[in-house]
Amino acid sequence: MSDPQTSMAATAAVSPSDYLQPAASTTQDSQPSPLALLAATCSKIGPPAVEAAVTPPAPPQPTPRKLVPIKPAPLPLSPSKNSFGILSSKGNILQIQGSQLSTSYPGGQLVFAIQNPTVVNKGTRSNTSIQYQAVPQIQASSPQTIQVQPSLTNQIQIIPGTNQAIITPSPSSHKPVPIKPAPVQKSSTTTTPAQSGANVVKLTGGGGNVTLTLPVNNLVNTSDPGAATQLLTESPPAPLSKTNKKARKKSLPAAQPPVAVAEQVETVLIETTADNIIQAGNNLLIVQSPGGGQPAVVQQVQVVPPKAEQQQVVQIPQQALRVVQAASATLPTVPQKPSQNFQIQAAEPSPTQVYIRTPSGEVQTVLVQDSPPATAATASTTTCSSPASRAAHLSGTSKKHSAAILRKERPLPKIAPAGSIISLNAAQLAAAAQAMQTININGVQVQGVPVTITNTGGQQQLTVQNVSGNNLTISGLSPTQIQLQMEQALAGETQPGEKRRRMACTCPNCKDGDKRSGEQGKKKHVCHIPDCGKTFRKTSLLRAHVRLHTGERPFVCNWFFCGKRFTRSDELQRHARTHTGDKRFECAQCQKRFMRSDHLTKHYKTHLVTKNL
């Protein structure tokens, strides 16, 4: 071990491993193997006696072969004599201290501990960012506090902290504007405890706008409260001075990777004036002052940063919100028009002849004539009253001009358009004849337009027209139709209380039926509608059948909100039982009642079937 060259040339019997090199490998003289250099370096450790004492007896070793001498690479001068250097395959030199070597491992192998080199993380900032180290300054005037709410993807909204507002703008915000920090003064090297954890950014006053935008990913929060906060802004690469390089070297080792905290808030002091406008992202906040040296007032609004796949929630505190004091325009009050009352002075109306036709077929002619009212009416209306009060309001009724057709079924004196009852008030019609302004029918007021009242069948029942003269025209049917109906009514006029006799059929289409010798045959009543030819035994049946062809349904149900029409009277009577619930047909065996006789007959058959079983 006295000569290093001879010791490395000798056979190193450390262990039967890959550290040995055969003598035939002459091509590696120019480039020594790293394993060979490691074996040569390890051969310098301690005297052989120590290794023999520690190393346990090994199995018989194979015959060693001669190694080619390898020239070690030159090692740099080390301040310690116990340090060793290892040349890697890439040409790097690793220094190993003597205290890191251990020869007590069994098997004669060498174990040494190599500490991992310190890796400097350079990925905490972007390539195009410039690092500014802003030193806190002493500010004489009272500044406004602004809170910055960092977010993962969005930018930061900065709002003067009179009410401590935090707003996070939408992700689609414009590119941040670089911030130029205030120049560092010599007096700012000594920081005060009151401003050790905050930066001061001064915005120039005046009437111009001030735009301040901070990217979220450029905020670094240090754990040391006394350390200066680092502000990173995106800007084009610029040459760095020596002072900035020194400041970076000092700040990088002390900087720690930022912790992902959702509610982390950094306070920045911004000195603003009354005319400043602060804008961040797509949001705009205008700070105005009413003047006179009064401080600006800002509304307090807090915006919760949105989470993943959630909508942004805006929360307004329950405290009293102070609104920005500014000149506000008072909206003029809308003048309301006073209610107008129409004063109507009715003159002596002329007699009016009214034709009223009920659904049962009755046609009445009424002569209406009223005396002028004592006082003027405040509003002219046409209202609906009950049919019982119709006779009280109508005057001048003459029996000579009235005709009624009495039938077996009960009369239906009511007019039921859409199920409602309509009657005429003669006094109000007389007032409406002079100046008709409003017509009130079933709660619906119509001004200045003619009103036509129809029933559910579509037939015209009553027409009220606004005429220019002093007369009010009320008519339900055309004059020709009224004349025809009056003739039919007068032809069948009978006295009240008399029974209607059955009249013989005089229809030319009707012919005698088959009769035997010596017997009077029955006449057949044939339907004269083309392509029909049906025959009936009774004229009533023929008339009811003809109504099916013509679509005439003279029998109307007078029940409230019903108004159904039928071609035969028995159909109307049968339908009326559905409203009254009358069940006049009773079963003799089980006392079950039915509305219709055919239903009772069908039910009686069930008893016959059970009896036969």
UniProtKB/Swiss-Prot annotation:
Biased region (Polar residues) positions are 23-32, 185-197
Q: Which SMART domains match?
A: ZnF_C2H2 (SM00355)
**Record-level GO BP terms:** regulation of transcription by RNA polymerase II
Q: What protein am I looking at?
A: Transcription factor Sp2
**Which Pfam family is an annotated match for this chain, by its short name?**
zf-C2H2
- Broad class of where this protein is predominantly found: nucleus
Compositional bias (Low complexity): 374-392
